[in-house]
Amino acid sequence: MKSSILEKLERLKERYEEVSALLSEADVINNQARFRDLSKEYAELEPVVVAYKGYLQLLADIEEAKHLIAEGDADMREMAEEELEGCEARLEPTELELQKLLLPKDPNDEKNCYLEVRAGTGGDEAAIFSGDLFRMYSRYAETQGWRVEILSQSEGEHGGFKEIISLVSGSGVYSKLKFESGAHRVQRVPETESQGRIHTSACTVAVMPEADELEEVNINKADLRIDTYRASGAGGQHVNKTDSAIRITHIPTGIVVECQDERSQHKNRARAMSLLATKLKTMQEEAAHKSISEERRNLVGSGDRSERIRTYNYPQGRVTDHRINLTLYSLDAVMQGDLEPVIGPLANEYQADQLAAIAD
């Protein structure tokens, strides 16, 4: 392992021991905020330091085995050779695990996220496919124990959605869905196609981590235009009876958000403000991170909706992710929500890029 990585691990070990000592001091125990912050730091350092101590012990065991091979009798040498073989086999996986523990944590990974699916080129077929994509994500969310709340939707004339916006809540939502932003292309024979010709259409997906609180983004109320209107689409008897739906326009940026799912105008307004804050924060972060690494831009997405990331080919039963040249012939399972075989390799590739950056 590189000396720079070992030096970093040694510093973390020293800090861990320092924090451990501080947590037993009376003045720290009596200061709730300080105690909470140190406890959090201790919990973050502990898995790294425990793994590092295991690594140091492994190195010590290797040296001990080598010493016995050089100095011991025949029986001892045979045992030591077996021990050395076992230790050396564990060395590389242990080093890799340590390096993974050192990877910077994405502060957004544990956040809920807004999921937007929009029909692109392809007319009615694109709208139908946007419905298929949203159903795919909803079923995947079920397997993860997440909750999906639809905030607004515009239905297609022949099914599906021109646009559907939802909030996905649960554990580690953004860490899994962050690889989904971009253009998704479908190749299939539409039900309305009498000649059996394959059509190509596309939908765009945007995934944005939910802003923690509105305070994260400075929103001047004078910059907002707020309109109320009657909700449309499915929703029961209350639809079209009250102006409960909310549309908020952020005049400086032109961002428009809507929420029509809740029966209460107050709740719709709160949801719309949260979505607006998230969009503004995402815009600010994209502007601040223009120098982001090419690898991360390719995998997590640049926010450019025209960036084609995946093709769903129905005649061949094929799903291809163009960012990592991944091809799977399990389209039916993927569309039923079995996304792990797609998301897993993307996450692994992303992690490999980060590890390469550490090694540089």
Curated annotation (Swiss-Prot):
The keyword Cytoplasm applies. GO terms for molecular function: translation release factor activity, codon specific. The modification N5-methylglutamine is found at residue 237. GO terms for cellular component: cytoplasm. It comes from the Bacteria. HAMAP family: Rel_fac_1. Peptide chain release factor 1 directs the termination of translation in response to the peptide chain termination codons UAG and UAA. Belongs to the prokaryotic/mitochondrial release factor family. This is Peptide chain release factor 1.
